[in-house]
């Protein structure tokens, strides 16, 4: 029998409550939570005749444990030993649920964390320990076991693990439910979803975060009903008949869907230069409908509206630095926490920088660092570069580039920074250079682009490969694109844009698409956007942005609670409460 298999009589048949779509938990090792003994517990230990207790475990195994040790790591024992139960001071307690080896294993988890060691636990062992850890309320071990389980979720085991978690640990069930919502397109493609219970499928279909294409919703319901008996699918049939409606899609086709859904991923546009100065609107691209919409960003953050600035999202922190507001060049840094919705001023850069390019790499410990390369300080173009550690709130100068560059493109490839093109005040560059953060050294690329470019943008599209798009060659705005393969050191042409542009922004989404938006087309700032399908090698026109702007910056957010505020899609409680 599969370790996740449980009898039908044991199943908790309701999907998690609304918190399932709001819960956001980091899947990392849990820190040790220190506890302080209450006066009642201390007094109980002082009055008891024995500081040890004998536990009669599974198969009548008898093991002697220290009361303090058990109380320190288990809420169950802490309450048992400190309460006025008849057997609280008893020297013997029976717990048939757990074996001696498993209890010893659970106790070693927090001890290992105290020594800075990460315990090695397999998925099967974690599932076996879930029930006893939950019963004994061993929070440190339970959190770590939950982390192990969440890291090993696949489309094949996720449904069984969800049902198991509902029995023993609802916090884990919420996390697995959230993962099931994210992975549902894969569950559909592999037909694994057919093993869902009727109420589980209804619960998923009512979730606004469900990752399912609109054209597949009818197929999901029809195939599930065919796979199950009429008695098992009666409620789903009624649910579908009541809630399916026709909603228009961007490609002019129409699909029957249960409800409006929020995309798992989004592109957010900050700042830029519009017709009346710095752009004030913050726009978000709905990647389900491929439409731009103005979002309500009601947070009073000083100097968040900039043009020609740098911006990165690092561990829930939106970091904005440098740039230009039409009057002065910025040296300041602003950090906005996407989880707490709080902002703070960061340390100033070592120099003012507008027309700056930004990138992110990880240090040898895996910690993310933000880099600002080149730009202009109001007097001259810069060849300097510096890195920012937001934890220490410190900018540190690194090795200078070999050439002054403003309005160039910077991209991260294989944890190295590649700076391409740009302008030095006299010449537009055709070459590029690579920065190795380990050696703190820049060295030139092995070949030049096919044309000079400034005001261009670059994205990393796969391992060791980047794409540079658009720009200005000194005579005209460019609609061309090229890719550079670090392994062979050569440039190759790519399909041309539908609109020539410079000083725009681009980003990759879903490993399949490259989105570009805004910029200057040679006559005026533009609101046009388009995307490149990397599979078909074709550019596709998208609906316009709400505001024409250049010098904008775009970032991607994936499966983040902050998307709820940006899109503001109603929960549609009428669908949920009726079922």
Curated annotation (Swiss-Prot):
Superkingdom of source: Eukaryota
Cellular-component GO terms for this entry: Cul3-RING ubiquitin ligase complex; cytoplasm
GO molecular function: ubiquitin-like ligase-substrate adaptor activity
Pfam families: BACK, BTB, Kelch_1, Kelch_KLHDC2_KLHL20_DRC7
SUPFAM superfamilies: Kelch motif, POZ domain
Listed Gene3D superfamilies: 1.25.40.420, Kelch-type beta propeller, Potassium Channel Kv1.1, Chain A
A single BP term in Gene Ontology: proteasome-mediated ubiquitin-dependent protein catabolic process
Record domain BTB: where: 51-119
Entry protein name: Kelch repeat and BTB domain-containing protein F47D12.7
PROSITE patterns per the UniProt record, alphabetical: BTB
The keyword Nucleotidyltransferase belongs to this UniProt entry's keyword annotation: no
Disulfide cross-links: none
Kelch repeats: 266-316, 317-363, 369-415, 417-463, 465-511, 513-559
InterPro entries assigned: BACK, BTB-kelch_protein, BTB/POZ_dom, Kelch-typ_b-propeller, Kelch_1, SKP1/BTB/POZ_sf
Organism: Caenorhabditis elegans
Keywords, alphabetical: Kelch repeat, Repeat
């Amino acid at each position: 029998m599969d370790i996740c298999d449980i009898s039908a009589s044991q199943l908790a048949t309701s999907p998690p409550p609304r918190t399932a779509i709001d819960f956001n938990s980091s899947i990392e090792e849990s820190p040790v939570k220190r506890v302080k003994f209450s006066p009642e517990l201390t007094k109980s230990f002082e009055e008891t005749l024995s500081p040890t207790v004998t536990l009669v475990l599974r198969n009548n195994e008898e093991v002697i444990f220290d009361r303090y040790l058990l109380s320190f790591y288990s809420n169950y024992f802490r309450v048992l030993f400190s309460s006025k139960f008849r057997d609280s001071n008893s020297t013997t307690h029976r717990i048939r649920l757990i074996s001696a080896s498993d209890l010893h294993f659970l106790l070693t988890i927090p001890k290992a964390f105290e020594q800075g060691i990460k315990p090695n636990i397999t998925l099967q062992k974690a599932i076996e320990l879930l029930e006893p850890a939950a019963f004994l309320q061993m929070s440190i071990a339970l959190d770590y076991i939950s982390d192990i389980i969440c890291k090993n979720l696949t489309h094949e085991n996720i449904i069984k693990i969800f049902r198991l978690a509902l029995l023993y640990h609802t916090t884990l069930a919420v996390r697995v439910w959230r993962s099931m919502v994210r992975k549902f397109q894969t569950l559909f493609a592999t037909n694994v979803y057919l093993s869902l219970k009727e109420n589980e499928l209804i619960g998923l279909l009512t979730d606004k975060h469900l990752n399912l294409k609109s054209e597949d919703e009818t197929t999901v319901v029809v195939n599930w009903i065919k796979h199950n008996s009429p008695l098992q699918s009666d409620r789903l049939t009624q649910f579908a008949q009541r809630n399916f409606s026709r909603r228009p899609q961007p490609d002019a086709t129409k699909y029957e869907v249960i409800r409006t859904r929020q995309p798992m991923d989004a592109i957010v546009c900050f700042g830029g230069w519009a017709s009346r100065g710095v752009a004030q609107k913050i726009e978000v691209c709905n990647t389900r409908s491929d439409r731009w919409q103005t979002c309500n960003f009601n947070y009073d953050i000083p100097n968040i509206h900039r043009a020609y600035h740098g911006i990165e999202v690092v561990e829930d922190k939106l970091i904005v630095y440098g740039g230009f507001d039409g009057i002065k060049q910025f040296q300041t840094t602003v950090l906005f926490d996407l989880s707490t919705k709080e902002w703070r001023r960061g340390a100033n850069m070592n120099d003012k920088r507008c027309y700056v390019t930004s990138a992110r790499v990880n240090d040898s410990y895996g910690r993310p660092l933000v880099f600002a390369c080149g730009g202009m300080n109001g007097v001259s173009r810069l060849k300097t570069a510096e890195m920012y550690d937001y934890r220490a709130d410190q900018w540190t100068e690194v090795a200078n580039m070999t050439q002054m560059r403003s309005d160039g493109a910077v991209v991260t490839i294989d944890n190295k920074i590649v700076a391409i093109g740009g302008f030095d005040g006299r010449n537009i560059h055709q070459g590029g250079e690579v920065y190795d953060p380990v050696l703190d050294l820049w060295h030139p690329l092995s070949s030049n682009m096919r044309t000079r470019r400034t005001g261009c943008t670059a994205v990393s599209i796969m391992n060791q490969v980047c794409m540079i798009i658009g720009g200005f060659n000194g005579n005209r705005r460019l609609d061309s694109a090229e890719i550079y393969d670090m392994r062979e050191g050569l440039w190759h042409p790519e399909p041309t844009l539908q609109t020539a542009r410079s000083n725009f922004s681009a980003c990759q989404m879903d490993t399949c698409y490259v989105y570009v938006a805004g910029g200057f087309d040679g006559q005026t700032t533009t609101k046009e956007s388009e995307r490149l399908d990397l599979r078909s090698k074709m550019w596709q026109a998208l609906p316009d942005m709400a505001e024409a702007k250049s010098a904008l910056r775009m970032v991607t957010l994936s499966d983040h609670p902050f998307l709820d505020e940006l899109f503001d899609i109603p929960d549609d409680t009428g669908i949920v409460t009726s079922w």
